[in-house]
Amino acid sequence: MVHEAPHASSFQMLLQLLLLLLLRAEPLRSAELTFELPDNAKQCFHEEVEQGVKFSLDYQVITGGHYDVDCYVEDPRGNVIYRETKKQYDSFTYKTEAKGVYRFCFSNEFSTFSHKTVYFDFQVGDEPPILPDMGNRVTALTQMESACVTIHEALKTVIDSQTHYRLREAQDRARAEDLNSRVSYWSVGETIALFVVSFSQVLLLKSFFTEKRPVNRAVHS
């Protein structure tokens, strides 16, 4: 008879409980998008939000120009509740005072030739507890429940870190490609200039060693 190790059985139970809790948890209403913003252009997004609900907006310019963009948020009445100009990145959190469609816009109208790539993450509402009635419980969490909560928080941290590093990698790659293009153009320009200078020197040296013979003209009387 083969006996299963106690720690292996506990680990399987922990995974099953964590899976059930993740399936029961209601996700946040969120939108995560990376889009192109041409020069002299503005892009707006709309989201209907209930009254008394908190929403948050995080954005960052990945590529283009000085990595800056104008951003503003309007409530359903048309009042501007957030406005920033030429920001590389920022975060904004707001608790709604009225139900309706909220609009947030990104503007690149101040730029005449710089094409931008913008990332934003828009979340509505608070994250529900991973365990039911977690805030109203009288008894303490069991060891397995505490482990599930810890794993859930660690997974959230991993997701946030991956998003951060993915944006940093995209931004660094864009800068490296831009630098590579500039170095390539500079190298081509130097090559052409070197060729022109070398050809001019050859012609100049050739003129030094070319014998100039006087032309004798016969004078007829």
UniProtKB/Swiss-Prot annotation:
One of its GO terms (cellular component) is endoplasmic reticulum-Golgi intermediate compartment. Gene3D superfamilies: GOLD domain. The keyword Repeat does not apply. A motif (COPI vesicle coat-binding) lies at residues 208-221. Keywords: Cytoplasmic vesicle, Endoplasmic reticulum, Golgi apparatus, Membrane, Methylation, Protein transport, Signal, Transmembrane, Transmembrane helix, Transport. Residues 1-25 form the signal peptide. A motif (COPII vesicle coat-binding) lies at residues 208-209. It comes from the Eukaryota. Its main location: endoplasmic reticulum. The modification Dimethylated arginine is found at R103. It is found in: Endoplasmic reticulum-Golgi intermediate compartment membrane; Golgi apparatus, cis-Golgi network membrane; Golgi apparatus, Golgi stack membrane; Endoplasmic reticulum membrane. Residues 206-221 are cytoplasmic. It is a single-pass type I membrane protein. Residues 28-184 are lumenal. The chain crosses the membrane at residues 185-205. Belongs to the EMP24/GP25L family. Monomer in endoplasmic reticulum, endoplasmic reticulum-Golgi intermediate compartment and cis-Golgi network. Interacts (via C-terminus) with COPG1; the interaction involves dimeric TMED3; however, there are conflicting reports on the interaction. Interacts with GORASP1 and GORASP2. This is Transmembrane emp24 domain-containing protein 3. It comes from Mus musculus (Mouse).
